A protein has these predicted regions:
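Conserved small-residue
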Residues: 22-25, 43-299
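Bacterial signal peptide processing site
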Residues: 37-39
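N-terminal secretory signal peptides
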Residues: 1-35
Length: 299
C-alpha cells in the first residue's frame, strides 16, 4: 500500500537513519524534510529505498530541454509494507569555472586542466584575457564514503564524490576546437552531510595528480567498484599506427608535455582506478593488464 500522508520530520530522519548513505543534496533533502507534518509517534522501520523514473523532456516543452529537470521521486518502503514518496530536486554544488575551496584556506578552479607537472594549462586564444582552461563536460561520478575520515572543518558526516571531466568543447575564443586535446582532470569533492537535514555542502575540492599514469585522455562514464573505489574510463584508445598524423593526439601531447611527440599512445585507452584517502585526497592507477579497449562503465 502507499502511505497517503507525509511523515513528520522526526519520522523521516528515523527512517533514513537506516540507510548506509543517502546521496541527497540541499534541495532534495529540504524537499524531503520541510514538507513533513503529523504526529511524532513511533514509526515503522526502514526496509528499502528506490527511485522512480522520469520521462525525458521533448520539443513539446522546449524550455525544459534547455535546463535541468527533476521529475523523479524517492520511495521509502517500511516494515509495515507502506511506502512513502518524496519529490526530488536538483541543486549544483558549483559550475565548472567557479573558484571553490581547496580545503587549505585557498581556492582552486573547478574543472581546471593541469599539465604533467601539475601546472595550469593556459588558454591564450584571446589576447589579454589569458586564463586556465576548464572543462564544460563533467561526466562519470562516484559517491562514496571512506572509513575514519580525517578531513578537518566538518560539522557532520564526510561523504566523497569523485568527479571526472571528459573534455572542454571550445577555447574561450569560441572558434578553437579543444575536444580531446587536453588531459582529463579528476577531482575529489569532500562533502559535509548535515546529520539533522541530510544536506550536502562542498567543503573541499582536490585535483587528483594523474602524472604517474601519464595523464588521462577523454574520461567518459564511470562506475563505483564493490570495494569502494572509482572506476574511470578512457573512452577511446588512440590508434598507434596513425598517431604521427593524428592532430588531436598531437595537440593533447603538446598541452600535457609541451611536446607534440612525447605522449605514448599505448599509455591511453586503459582502465583508471581512483582510491580516495581519508583526508579527501586520492591516488590513481591504470590497469594496463586489462588491455586497451573502451572500458566505459565497467561493472
Amino acid at each position: 500500500m502507499t502511505q497517503p500522508t507525509m511523515p513528520t520530520r522526526r519520522k523521516a530522519l528515523q527512517l533514513l537513519a537506516g540507510v548506509p548513505m543517502l546521496p541527497l543534496s540541499a534541495s532534495a533533502s529540504a524537499a524531503l524534510l520541510t514538507a513533513c507534518g503529523g504526529s511524532d509517534s513511533a514509526a515503522p522501520s526502514f526496509v528499502s529505498a528506490s527511485f522512480t523514473s522520469m520521462a525525458a523532456p521533448t520539443l513539446a516543452n522546449a524550455a525544459a530541454m534547455a535546463t535541468t529537470t527533476v521529475g523523479s521521486t524517492l520511495n521509502i518502503k517500511l516494515s509495515d509494507d507502506s511506502v512513502r514518496s518524496y519529490q526530488l530536486a536538483y541543486q549544483p554544488f558549483f559550475v565548472t569555472g567557479d573558484m571553490v575551496s581547496d580545503g587549505k584556506g585557498g581556492t582552486i578552479l573547478s574543472g581546471g586542466y593541469y599539465d604533467i607537472n601539475n601546472k595550469p594549462i593556459i588558454d591564450a586564444t584571446v589576447a589579454g584575457k589569458e586564463r586556465q582552461y576548464f572543462s564544460d563536460s563533467p561526466d562519470g561520478t562516484s559517491l562514496l564514503t571512506v572509513a575514519n575520515p580525517t578531513v578537518t572543518g566538518l560539522k557532520g558526516k564526510a561523504v566523497f564524490a569523485v568527479v571526472q571531466f571528459e573534455y572542454t568543447t571550445w577555447a574561450q575564443d569560441g572558434k578553437t576546437d579543444m575536444y580531446g586535446k587536453l588531459p582529463s582532470p579528476i577531482a575529489v569533492l569532500t562533502l559535509d552531510q548535515d546529520q539533522t537535514t541530510g544536506k550536502l555542502s562542498l567543503v573541499k575540492y582536490h585535483n587528483v595528480d594523474t602524472s604517474k599514469v601519464h595523464g588521462l585522455w577523454i574520461t567518459c562514464g564511470a562506475s563505483l567498484s564493490p570495494w569502494g573505489t572509482h572506476l574511470s574510463s578512457e573512452e577511446y584508445e588512440p590508434d598507434a599506427f596513425s598517431i604521427a598524423s593524428n592532430a588531436m593526439f598531437k595537440a593533447y601531447s603538446k598541452n600535457l608535455y609541451g611536446d607534440e611527440t612525447k605522449a605514448n599512445p599505448y599509455h591511453y585507452g586503459h582502465m583508471p582506478e581512483v582510491t580516495v584517502n581519508p583526508d579527501g585526497t586520492a591516488s590513481i592507477k591504470k590497469h594496463f593488464c586489462m588491455g586497451r579497449i573502451s572500458h566505459e562503465l565497467v561493472q
